[in-house]
Structures are given as structure tokens and as C-alpha cells.
């Protein structure tokens, strides 16, 4: 009962279904605050508390694992469905955070069934997601600063006018989708591999892992759609009239792009 209550509290802190409502509203905060909130601060507290509770609890009843993986799957699918109507880039990223944290809860839930690999992947994903989501939110903020809009339908031809922002957009989108060689690929792979290991003796877990793989592919397709719309081609009217990208922003983007690419193997080796 205590672990289930800890899990319930963790859902609230990490904006999982049914306690997700506060997070999309928080994206109205200034972009640096949103990047900190979604990347490294409040939303990560819940998953860290639950992970620590699992480590400290010893033998964890399987019911805790079942509740964790089932709610994670519901949240994962809900987060993806909420991608579809979004046109505001920051609001899309808010629902992306909800879905990405569900991967972490899924991996932690799998660890209850004996998968250390899934646990390691979940912990790695906390770090890897931080770099990718911080980059994506700061890219969105740069569009608001230079273009006066972050509405995706108005963003076309970004690479031609803002090559660094365009590359950052593409790298962050691929990272959120878990595409190699981006950092999140390595942590998602650990979670999925751990899930298949557990699923070898449990058909229900195997089905849930297959659904996770399908959701990951669908997420990639959705972000690929917006990459194909926003990045190539001639700049739209809003992009063509945009102000120059400040050098300080460009420097931060370059650093984060590098970290998104190299932090995956580093976090995996650090976790061991």
C-alpha cells in the first residue's frame, strides 16, 4: 500500500494520467522556465522518488509493477493522441513531456518483474530526455523571440534562414522520437530490451512492450511530418521577416546539440 501511495504521488509530480492537467498550462511560463521545468526540475521529481522507493523497498509486490506499467501505457497513448491537434510548439512539447515520462515509469514498472536493464534504461532516460527537451523548448523560445510566433503552421524554410535553429529543431525532434544516434535511443532501447526479456515469460507484458514500440514509431512519424513541413523549402512570410538569431542563443543550441548526440552512451556507461 505504501509503494502504491508513493507511485500515486509520483504520478502527480510527473504529470501522468490522471494527474496531468497542470503541466500543459505550465508551458505558458517564460521559455527558460519551461525548459527547466520540463527538462530537469519538477517533472523529474516524481520518477526519481519512485525509482528510489523501488531501490529501497527490497522485494516489491508485482501489483505495484502492474499498476505502474498499465498507467504508463495509458499515459503514453494519451500523450501521443494529444500530439495530433497541437499547433502551438510549446503545447506540443508539454504533451511530449507527459509521454516521455511514461517511458520512465514503464521501465521502472518492468524492473519490479526482475528487469535490471529496464530500470537502468529508465534512469538513463531521465538524463537523456533532459538534454533533448531543454533544446527543443529553447528552440521554440528562439522562434518566439526572432519571429514573434511559435505556431508550427507558420514555420517554413527554417533551415535556409536559421540553419543552427533548424538543425537544433531536427536533432531535438529525432531525439524525442528515439532515433539513433540520438541519446534517447539508447535509453529507450534498454527499456524495450528489458521488456522483451520479461515478456518472454509473460504474454501481457510482451503485448504492452509491442504497443510501446508501435507508439515510438508513430511518434517518429508525427515529428518527421513537422520536420518535413518546417525545415526545408523557402522561408514563410514570418520566417523571412524574422530578426537575426543572437549569438548567445546559437552557442547554447550548439552545446545542447552536441550533448544530445553524445550523452546517450555516456549515461549508459555511467549507469553501468
Residue positions per predicted region:
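Cytoplasmic/organellar membrane-interface segments at the starts of transmembrane helices
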Residues: 159-167, 220-272
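Hydrophobic transmembrane alpha-helices and their helix-loop junctions in integral membrane proteins
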Residues: 1-229
Amino acid at each position: 500500500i505504501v509503494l502504491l501511495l508513493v507511485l500515486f504521488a509520483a504520478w502527480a509530480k510527473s504529470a501522468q494520467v490522471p494527474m496531468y492537467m497542470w503541466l500543459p498550462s505550465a508551458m505558458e511560463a517564460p521559455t527558460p522556465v519551461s525548459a527547466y521545468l520540463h527538462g530537469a526540475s519538477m517533472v523529474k521529481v516524481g520518477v526519481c522518488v519512485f525509482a528510489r522507493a523501488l531501490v529501497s523497498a527490497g522485494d516489491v509486490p508485482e501489483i505495484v509493477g502492474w499498476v505502474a506499467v498499465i498507467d504508463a501505457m495509458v499515459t503514453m497513448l494519451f500523450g501521443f493522441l494529444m500530439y495530433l491537434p497541437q499547433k502551438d510548439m510549446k503545447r506540443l512539447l508539454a504533451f511530449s513531456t507527459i509521454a516521455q515520462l511514461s517511458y520512465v515509469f514503464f521501465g521502472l514498472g518492468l524492473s519490479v518483474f526482475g528487469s535490471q536493464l529496464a530500470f537502468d534504461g529508465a534512469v538513463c532516460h531521465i538524463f537523456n530526455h533532459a538534454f533533448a527537451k531543454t533544446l527543443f523548448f529553447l528552440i521554440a523560445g528562439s522562434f518566439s523571440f526572432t519571429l514573434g510566433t511559435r505556431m508550427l503552421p507558420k514555420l517554413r524554410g527554417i533551415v535556409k534562414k536559421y540553419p543552427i535553429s533548424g538543425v537544433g529543431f531536427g536533432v531535438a525532434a529525432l531525439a524525442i522520437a528515439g532515433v539513433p544516434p540520438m541519446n534517447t535511443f539508447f535509453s529507450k532501447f534498454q527499456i524495450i530490451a528489458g521488456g522483451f526479456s520479461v515478456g518472454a515469460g509473460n504474454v501481457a507484458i510482451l503485448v504492452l512492450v509491442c504497443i510501446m514500440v508501435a507508439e515510438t514509431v508513430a511518434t517518429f512519424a508525427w515529428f518527421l511530418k513537422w520536420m518535413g513541413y518546417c525545415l526545408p523549402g523557402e522561408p514563410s512570410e514570418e520566417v523571412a521577416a524574422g530578426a537575426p538569431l543572437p549569438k548567445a542563443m546559437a552557442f547554447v543550441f550548439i552545446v545542447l546539440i552536441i550533448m544530445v548526440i553524445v550523452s546517450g552512451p555516456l549515461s549508459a556507461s555511467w549507469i553501468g
